[in-house]
Design a protein with these regions (language model features):
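Catalytic phosphate-handling regions of large nucleic-acid enzymes and associated NTPases
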Residues: 1-155
Length: 155
């Protein structure tokens, strides 16, 4: 038996897992698995929304872009994980992305170590890739609901 914080009620472990912990598990799955409609995870969708909102045609440090995204797209999971998502979206070695939407400028990782050897986000730069403008109209139609409420899409 365990107790809830601030109460004297007891709660069995099975009740805790089936009623309380399940909410975290569902939320974690939503953050971890890309959406079938656009292929983005919520963090990637917020990155693209912020890049289009800023009209990111010139280079910006990955650390600065992460700060901009967390401020303007209500990202609440820490800038370190956001920086990692930006780095993964810009990787262009064989086997990393089908189509990278962000242009890498600097050491964004290598195939040998699976991208884990990327430089620190304060030393590498990125901007929108040229191909992104070609698919921009389709991406914007999926990202538009973010503009109003600044929250994840619900399909």
């Amino acid at each position: 038996m365990c107790c809830r914080a601030g109460t004297e009620q007891s709660l069995s472990y099975s009740d805790f897992i089936n009623r309380d912990l399940i909410h975290f598990s569902v939320y974690d799955v939503k953050r971890s698995i890309p959406c079938v409609v656009d292929g983005f995870k919520p963090s990637q969708r917020k990155i693209m929304f912020s890049c289009f909102k800023r009209n990111l045609t010139s280079e910006i440090k990955v650390a600065q872009l992460a700060g901009y995204v967390s401020e303007n797209a209500s990202y609440h999971h820490g800038e370190a994980s956001l920086q990692g998502a930006i780095i993964c979206m810009a990787q262009d070695y064989v086997g990393s992305n089908n189509m990278n939407l962000l242009r890498p400028n600097g050491m964004f990782g290598s195939r040998r170590l699976g991208g884990k050897d990327a430089a620190s986000p304060r030393y590498i730069y990125t901007q929108l890739e040229a191909i992104t403008n070609k698919v921009r109209r389709a991406l914007i139609s999926w990202l538009l609901p973010l503009a109003g409420a600044l929250r994840s899409l619900r399909w």
